[in-house]
């Protein structure tokens, strides 16, 4: 039996089987694009699809965890529509003639790094939000399927980190507890 020591966010004890969530890192390739106008249209369609998904997550979270906690998905929508974020992606596609997935991944990494290097702990935690939004947008661009949480058995979820969008998609009756390596009280 292995024993780990950590900081608890909530009081209580959970006993049950453990499900380890291992995320696969998507390797995003840089591909030269001749028709940047078509690539921007593809980006805009994926952005709209992502906005719809975030709206659905907001509605689900609103029902399950209340308005205060659901608000993170409105923040995600605002981040996705942020002019600086969108301008950086568009500029990269137009100026470097690269595929949208690559432009989103690079821009997301740059913005996430900027947040991670801020002095304020709350703002540092937004780094994970930028990565979550960017990863969702890349998945939508590439047609990669989202994780199907409906088949999950009741268990203690162990992961390096969990995003708000991952946790709200899980069936709360099947989650006994969360154990994460990364994250903070502000995440």
What are these model-predicted stretches?
Residues 1-187:
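Non-catalytic, soluble scaffold/interaction modules
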